[in-house]
């Protein structure tokens, strides 16, 4: 909708809580460029509670430690998610319980096939999946990842010389898939990206 309306000078994605904090604390002039939408974690949590009732507990599993602060420290999303476990914490939990995931039987999740939306956690995944096939109006789509690159972009945006762009921005290089609690030492970025893209 935001892209079709075309009212914003630039649009900065608000999926990454580290990006949101960075802008709000160090680049406050750019706050009007932030997409006025909650993160996918918050949106999904709210959707689950609207379908199954307010007394259901939602637990988010992922590679991002910043999501913990988002869930408890950001008034805009408070209550959407009840607990957050990182992949690292889950792995340690399984180990403490003597669970070897490789010995477990595969079970289908029973959810609808997410299709291209599985690309979301890799750099450029929002553009490739969520915005794929949408009318982007006059906006040029760009994805930026890595803290240094994000800061360079924000400095350029503060100068006011860049217009009519949609920026998908992630602090983690490679996107969420390479988050700090993703067991990243076990898999290269290229391998992680290939594994996700093969599933689509």
What is the meaning of each model-derived region?
Residues 1-200:
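Iron-sulfur-associated redox domains of electron-transfer enzymes in respiratory
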